[in-house]
């Protein structure tokens, strides 16, 4: 009989969001008249920018003509999109990232998982706690984490707690780690990092020859001009960091699928003999073997994000969701909750009432207010006692959900 990858058996009972869906489905089946408002999964709700819809429509029509038809595209992405990304997202901020260093993909979730294909399995990995579950689970699946401990953590990972005490800023590891996952603006806490703090991480990585995997999926929601949008705003980062970006949240592409990963050409690792190996070439080889590229139609839609109309419409979407976050902050604070995040990210991170666990509070909100959020413990041991609410919803739903919560 065929043997399975037993690393999958080390995973916790279920990925966080399917577990939430299961509980909500059980509740709605038992309470058919309930009108549940979901502020849990970070999926967008508002329509795509008109500029993107128009561009994709035109691209679709092109595909129906002999002259305009496109077959397989470049695995790295079309040059015209990569150039727009380079100029608008990096060079405009003083980051010297060339179009060749940008790889277009169908999602940063996929890329942050697939990047492990080019990294050795014996690297020591550090993650924040709480953390986006994908970082941990994909390392478990590939056998990099060791055994599961009784408290639900993994023997082979280094956990960097982020909490009220350290203002949700992970401390630099006391020992050398090979790979560090950083996500700012942070999912799930909504915290941000200053240039000064990020510089400490870059300095650590250079000194220890470590690699930073920097998830900037929520950078478009930054309101504070002093907060960095990219790790490449920090001197030296091109020698130690890979950055993941996405069109999912800023342009509403969760159902369209387009993202990109930046791998600087001078970024390198080493083989077992100690020889330098450049990571750009490995990732390019990986993509050419395992990926056929993002569709032409979708890439034209992504290109439209950088048009003058597209920029206005994307900014309007961001303003809409950030207003939702502001409403949530104000209402929850007026009800006596401790609230974090929501200033530069579309998530608010709240302290649950005393003597309640995160899952207790989940059930409490569901049963008393018909509101769904995400238990902090689902993001890691240090997330216990917290709860995430997402600003990705309609204004009416956000207002109604807040009224329900404060009137419990």
Curated annotation (Swiss-Prot):
GO terms for biological process: lysine biosynthetic process via diaminopimelate, diaminopimelate-aminotransferase pathway. One of its GO terms (molecular function) is L,L-diaminopimelate aminotransferase activity. Pyridoxal 5'-phosphate binds at residues 72, 108-109, 132, 187, 218, 246-248, 257, 292. Pfam families: Aminotran_1_2 (PF00155). Substrate binds at residues 15, 42, 109, 132, 187, 292, 388. It catalyses: (2S,6S)-2,6-diaminopimelate + 2-oxoglutarate = (S)-2,3,4,5-tetrahydrodipicolinate + L-glutamate + H2O + H(+). Pathway: Amino-acid biosynthesis; L-lysine biosynthesis via DAP pathway; LL-2,6-diaminopimelate from (S)-tetrahydrodipicolinate (aminotransferase route): step 1/1. InterPro entries: Aminotransferase_I/II_large, DapL/ALD1, PyrdxlP-dep_Trfase, PyrdxlP-dep_Trfase_major, PyrdxlP-dep_Trfase_small. It is an enzyme of class 2 (transferase). Keywords: Aminotransferase, Pyridoxal phosphate, Transferase. The modification N6-(pyridoxal phosphate)lysine is found at residue 249. Its EC number is 2.6.1.83. Transmembrane segments: none annotated. It comes from the Bacteria. Its cofactor is pyridoxal 5'-phosphate. NCBIfam families: DAPAT_plant. Homodimer. Belongs to the class-I pyridoxal-phosphate-dependent aminotransferase family. LL-diaminopimelate aminotransferase subfamily. This is LL-diaminopimelate aminotransferase.
